[in-house]
Amino acid sequence: MKDLRFRPAAAEDFTFLATMLGESAVWRPDKRTPTGDEVLADARYAMYLAGWPRQGDYGLVAEQDGPVGAAWYRTFTETSHGHGFVTTDVPELAIAVIASRRHEGIGRRLLADLIEASIAQGYPAISLSVAGDNPARRLYESSGFVPVEQHGTSLTMIRHAARST
């Protein structure tokens, strides 16, 4: 990962984060990945970035000759929340790496750094939603995430802060 760097996500990264949200929402190679604009027009996904960055939001962007991946988390309310919602004090994360750069360890590093940040910020856990057949599920499980609920073909997974990476 020569010359690969990781930096905090900023307001200026909004468009790239929207693109990454599309990558995470439709990860199957045989399906068309929605554009950032399409993702933001879909209420199911727009909530992951609405008003970015809000108080408590945290994210990272991986860069090597331009952005290649991103991961971020935010908390939600009982009445307005994402697919991997657990409780109001557990942020839900979103993560994606551009297709041409997958399987290089970028996602693992983004995930590890985001977990570390959530612990440093005092969160008791971090959650996510993943399709049961998504290969990224293995990354999440190897990073300490465990399934807590199933919704159709998707799993809500949680990783408690006490577990070391």
What are the residue ranges of the model-derived segments?
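Conserved N-terminal entry element of GNAT/NAT acetyltransferase domains
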Residues: 1-12, 24, 163-165
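Hydrophobic pocket/interface hotspot
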Residues: 17
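Conserved acyl-donor/pantetheine-binding loop and adjacent beta-alpha core of acyl/acetyltransferases
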Residues: 63-64, 68-95
